[in-house]
């Protein structure tokens, strides 16, 4: 016997979270809980403002429609990426397809003072990998900060993300301030320039490896082995169903590319599922999931070792 519940939620964010020139004051989303007999599965649907093609309201409408169809015996999935991902996660938990084992390591995310990152990394066991957002300030400053971090921590590897912020000139200004001897320890720089061709040229000219992120969601993108391209960053909330995520990971691995499962600032429930997906599909690759510190609360399932308060299901608004 099938049954389902849908919850709506809103989590206050820390004051300094800015996405594409918009301050993100709250993170809004939905949960779906599917039951079939004794089994239960959860999924999170939380479109990311400025990045997702669908709004939270559109996702809610699509989710409620899909849940009603599922209750009637339908086996299909919704079209909207965030809804398809959340629904497929709930189904994968329900059927036991999604393994319980998780990779709760996370590449620390540096969003402010680089000194804070140095302190965090000093206590980090094993390989030291961190992520730094670039392109928010002057390119020269970004280059100096990256150089400082690589100089201060000789065994550090950095993942950088520019979100297509730079012109070719700005990208070159950044590279000029990174010691050529350190550039091999830049694991990759996500989408440095506004166009793929400019990003490819940047990789060739500087020797700094790049990764595709936004490009994966463009209609003309194809997976290819290219000079200077080292990785793809897969954000399941923006990608679609678990099957689509698996297809992208497999396509990347077939070409020798690193595939990194990455957060779209999901709640703790969604992040713990992404940690399980990473352990399942990209074992041995550190996922990019260090975004919980941007929020003021956890929900339903806490992240292991995190001290933020965790809300229970009866504290959320139920829609169904």
From Swiss-Prot:
Instruction: Quote the catalytic activity from the record.
Output: (1R,6R)-6-hydroxy-2-succinyl-cyclohexa-2,4-diene-1-carboxylate = 2-succinylbenzoate + H2O
Q: What is its cofactor? A: a divalent metal cation
Residues at the catalytic site: 133, 235
Keyword Transmembrane listed: no
Pathway given for this chain reads: Quinol/quinone metabolism; 1,4-dihydroxy-2-naphthoate biosynthesis; 1,4-dihydroxy-2-naphthoate from chorismate: step 4/7; Quinol/quinone metabolism; menaquinone biosynthesis
Q: Which GO terms describe its molecular function?
A: magnesium ion binding; O-succinylbenzoate synthase activity
**UniProt entry keywords in alphabetical sequence:** Lyase, Magnesium, Menaquinone biosynthesis, Metal-binding
**What's the protein called, per UniProt?**
o-succinylbenzoate synthase
Originating species: Salmonella paratyphi A (strain AKU_12601)
